[in-house]
């Protein structure tokens, strides 16, 4: 059984909801990212989503876009990101999910890319600009290498598309809570509860909710609606961006612990 699926199976058996923090690799620098992985792991992260900096991040809001730009300006490349993941093996227990756009995969070639991330110790993959109609070209070879490709359900997805995504998504289903890009919002759309029910009607696969969750009270609300995981990105990235590396890591740890406590 692959690491992401095993993590959710273990959590479900205990009646627990997963916490999945997201950070952008290389912001503010690679050393801080390496420390952040370890800090998030010990602060209660069940899985960790690590964003590969990309120049045209269509799904990302201003906080994560800015983080990616800073990392790219520092010269951060995929190989640097994978080196961080590789060095974390044995220390970081939480499975690491790589968040990357399709272009870097295409340019390397699917098999080469998958071999690279597998060797580094990546367990899962989120590709936000990969349409369902083209997902099979990545899903099958990834599964053969033990890497789970997590597909996204949008608030605008019709029932038949939700069913198709639920059927093919591996590890869990990533429910996008809002139409638009990532970012912090004052409240989580109540339609999320309805969308969770729609997904539940067609699959028993775990569902993680992301985009717009920035406070412990919101995380608890999403958990109470029936989510198997809460995904928090921009609010994590902002804590690293707004402080010195040492203060940012301290703030990151405190925030992660507060989220974990809220959903336990």
From Swiss-Prot:
One of its GO terms (molecular function) is tryptophan synthase activity. Keywords: Amino-acid biosynthesis, Aromatic amino acid biosynthesis, Lyase, Tryptophan biosynthesis. GO terms for cellular component: cytosol. CDD domains: Tryptophan_synthase_alpha. It catalyses: (1S,2R)-1-C-(indol-3-yl)glycerol 3-phosphate + L-serine = D-glyceraldehyde 3-phosphate + L-tryptophan + H2O. Its EC number is 4.2.1.20. Coiled coil: none annotated. The active site is at 49 (proton acceptor), 60 (proton acceptor). Pathway: Amino-acid biosynthesis; L-tryptophan biosynthesis; L-tryptophan from chorismate: step 5/5. Pfam families: Trp_syntA. The keyword GTP-binding does not apply. Belongs to the TrpA family. The alpha subunit is responsible for the aldol cleavage of indoleglycerol phosphate to indole and glyceraldehyde 3-phosphate. Tetramer of two alpha and two beta chains. This is Tryptophan synthase alpha chain.
């Amino acid at each position: 059984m692959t690491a992401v699926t095993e993590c959710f199976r273990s959590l479900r058996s205990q009646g627990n909801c997963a916490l999945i923090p997201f950070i952008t690799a290389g912001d503010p620098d690679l050393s801080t990212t390496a420390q952040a992985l370890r800090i998030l792991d010990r602060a209660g992260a069940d899985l960790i989503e690590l964003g590969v900096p990309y120049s045209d991040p269509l799904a990302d809001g201003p906080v994560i876009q800015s983080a990616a730009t800073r990392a790219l300006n520092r010269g951060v490349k995929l190989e640097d990101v994978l080196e961080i993941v590789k060095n974390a093996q044995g220390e970081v227990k939480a499975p690491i999910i790589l968040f990357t756009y399709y272009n870097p995969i295409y340019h390397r070639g699917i098999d080469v890319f998958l071999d690279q991330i597998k060797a580094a110790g990546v367990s899962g993959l989120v590709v936000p600009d990969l349409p369902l109609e083209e997902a099979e070209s990545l899903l099958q070879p990834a599964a053969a290498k033990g890497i789970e490709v997590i597909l996204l359900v949008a608030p605008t997805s019709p029932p038949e598309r939700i069913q198709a995504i639920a059927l093919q998504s591996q590890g869990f289903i990533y429910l996008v809570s809002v139409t638009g890009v990532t970012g912090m919002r004052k409240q989580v759309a109540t339609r999320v509860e309805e969308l969770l029910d729609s997904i539940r009607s067609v699959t028993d696969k775990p569902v993680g909710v992301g985009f717009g969750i920035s406070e412990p009270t919101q995380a608890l609300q999403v958990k109470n609606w029936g989510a198997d995981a809460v995904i928090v990105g921009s609010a994590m990235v902002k804590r690293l961006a707004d402080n010195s590396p040492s203060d940012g890591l301290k703030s990151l740890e405190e925030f992660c612990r507060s989220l974990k406590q809220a959903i336990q």
